[in-house]
Amino acid sequence: MKRVMDMWLSSTASLAQRRSQRQPCATAGAAPILALFFFALGFLMPVQAFAETVEQRIARLEPHYTIRRPENASGPAPVVIMLHGCGGPRPFISQMAEAAAEAGAAAIVVNSFAPRRISRVAAFATVCTGARLQGRERAGDLYATMAWARAQPWVDAARISVIGWSHGGWTIMDALALRSGEEMQRATGLENLSDEPLEGLAATMIVYPYTGVGTYTGRRDWRIAPRSTAIIAQRDYIVGSSRAALERQRARGAPMEILIFQNATHAFEDEHAEDPRVRYNPAATAREHDLLREMIAAL
């Protein structure tokens, strides 16, 4: 299996390099047949090559957290955990973290690639095609970050929220849908999870998520029911429309508001995107910031 992956990575390295500035979930790119093949291959490969404790996962993630805390906070503050898309951290996420701090919340930006030594080029070749680090595995990063956040004296553990873009949105919804116990441990590679690792999660914001093959969205009930807002970009030609899957999830009892951003593309917040399918939309970005502030105010 490793030999097959190495051969494919070698043959696609130049293509991935040319796309090094493009945005998450490039599954709909120039080689859809290969992308589909390797997405399917991801289900045949072990989700996690080794098991580790929650504390060990935290030790790997923590050096790469970017934390922005509100100024003049007089006590524990609400928190927004931020999960990037499959292209990795982007400048607009830092801007969202600043907006969260200005609204009175601390922001924890999770970099899921740095501790795994996944470069941006490798991410486009493997994560964006589904061959590596699928949402159910990355859910372990959210579980570990929740555990870390609850232990911080500056965090109000009853007012934790999470926002995820694209692959990050997939991660959030799979994290809510995994079954406690053996399935959750096998999917995330974490050995000592609590019965409910998302305890204290009060709200989510799910932005242009991938909801297709390999996700649990619309196919399973959530274990807990945080207030949720889902943003669909009307002109999303990267992950396609997620409306049907999100509506199925809502029909299963998820308290989710589904918003369609007209004339917005995937990664509409990214001023520096080079992918022709992506267009920066300042009005949509401002609206997203408003929704973030509303979520924080309601915590």
Which role fits each region the language model picked out?
Residues Y237-A244:
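Conserved alpha/beta-hydrolase "acid-adjacent" motif
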Residues P255-L299:
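C-terminal catalytic histidine-bearing segment of alpha/beta-hydrolase fold enzymes
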Residues P32-M45:
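Bacterial N-terminal signal peptides
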Residues A230-I232:
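Short beta-strand/loop motif that positions the catalytic acidic residue
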Residues Y143-R223:
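Primarily recognizes the serine-hydrolase "nucleophile elbow" in alpha/beta-hydrolase
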Residues Q234-Y237, N263-T265:
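Acidic beta-to-alpha connecting loop that harbors the catalytic carboxylate
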Residues M1-A28:
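N-terminal secretory signal peptides that target proteins for export/translocation
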